[in-house]
Amino acid sequence: MKHKICIYAIARNEEQFVDRFCDAAAEADYIAVLDTGSTDRTVEKLSDRGVIVRQTTIEPWRFDVARNLSMLLIPRDTDLCVCADLDEVLLPGWRAALE
């Protein structure tokens, strides 16, 4: 059985990592990112790559709130979730290793 996998993340001003992140996560069924106030092209680049991306502001900053909000972007039919940062790179074969 093939599982539906979602890679999800929180981002802010990480446009320099978007392409590398999306390329590494390309085997995922879904990629979802909660942007917490970027002033660069992070949101635009993620959208252009087909990522599920939403924007919010969290004041005062609370990582737990950001993480919980990011999880709301995960589609309901997802079987496995992987949390990553945009500056992280998934190793080749990551999907097969999970399945």
Regions found by a protein language model. Name each.
Residues 68-80:
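Active-site nucleotide-sugar/metal-binding loop of Leloir-type enzymes
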Residues 4-6, 30:
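Cell-envelope/extracellular polymer assembly enzymes that use nucleotide-activated donors
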Residues 41, 64-65, 86-99:
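Acidic donor-binding/catalytic loop of UDP-sugar-dependent glycosyltransferases
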Residues 27, 49-50:
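Short, structured coil segments at secondary-structure junctions
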Residues 58-66, 71:
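A short, glycine-/small-residue-rich helix N-cap motif at loop->alpha-helix starts
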Residues 9-27:
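Short, well-formed alpha-helical segments that are part of the catalytic scaffolds
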Residues 24, 34-45, 58, 85-86:
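A conserved acidic beta->alpha catalytic loop
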Residues 16-19, 40-48, 93:
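Acidic helix N-cap motif at the loop->helix transition within catalytic regions
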